[in-house]
């Protein structure tokens, strides 16, 4: 209908009827406009998961990010913004999942999201955006009979509802690690000394069963001694890292791993461990060029001491006496735009974190290779808590201590209930590593 036809019609319509129709038309337009601009797809274009003190469950927030990637979505990790927050496209399904898991979120309109992106990416602001776009395939190195509460990482994965696959020696030695993006190791002993529990637990049923299991497995895989088989596993893991894998280790899986690499051609195990005496010149025969993180360390060859070397600080034998209320370590701050990797690994809502012990509590700074990035340390001491390094096309991150919420974990202690520690800063460092392989690589700024 053209404007002339419209005019002819209106000339034959009573004025009050015409204006009544026009008013109704304007009301309908206004209602439609309001419904469009207040619909969830428009008013709530983004969903922000803040990771500062407002967050109700920091640990499950990582699980939400993982869940989103699993379902084909993407998330932006806002480094150094409100504790390392996550920004995602808003959907009703995502909002529902957050509510189910008790994760606090804030819906953002398009203009708010645009303003937030601009703020984070300002050149004078130590913040940046990292896109998470790939679901990492996670493997956890554990022996048969392992329970999820046996180490902090599997407890964190279980609590955050992040799926993982268990692997052990056969999978590692047969090349199966190539199927995974991320490998975790915890309270392991790659030296073949069964955790150096001999002095206190050699008569315990669990110790005897473990030794028999390890000996059977080594023989089945074609090795005469457990120590030789574990060294082969350590070398296979090193090859996995070199080919682009991500390794995260805690507690004794850190120093015992490097010791196994350095002692590749040296017998460092006494007769009660492998049936023959150790090489008395073992220390002089160590090859530090084969290690990833440590050098110039001295082995503790006493089979009755619960210690592998002088890497561990403070030494585990005798057990150190410390006040948990005064034991803290400090995270270093990195440039989000120029050093995104260490920045990702240190995202947290606090930068001073309560300490915790383990068979390997921390690392002696003077024994750490210069190529390694120190992520956290106990200020005023030689104790380094958290380190990161590169090897080949892959990376490794090592974290001292056994359980961030169990200060002095002992054999037989009950598992930590993470429902009571859902905002744990120490556990957040573990989960930073889980999401790290999901990050899209971008060109380094120069």
Task: Write out the residue ranges for each language-model feature.
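N-terminal secretory signal peptides that target proteins for export/translocation
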Residues: 1-21
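Bacterial N-terminal signal peptides
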Residues: 23-35
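Sec/Tat signal peptide C-region and signal peptidase I cleavage site
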Residues: 37-43
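Hydrophobic targeting/anchoring helices
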Residues: 43-151, 160, 401
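Extracellular ligand-binding/catalytic regions of CAZymes and related secreted enzymes
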Residues: 44-50, 56-87, 267, 367-446
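Helical hinge/lid and interdomain linker segments adjacent to catalytic or ligand-binding clefts
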Residues: 46-47, 52, 56, 86-87, ...
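Catalytic beta-strand/loop cores that center a nucleophilic Ser/Cys/Thr
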Residues: 151, 158, 255, 274, ...
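Catalytic cores of eukaryotic secretory-pathway lumenal/extracellular enzymes that build
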Residues: 222-223, 262, 271-273, 280-284
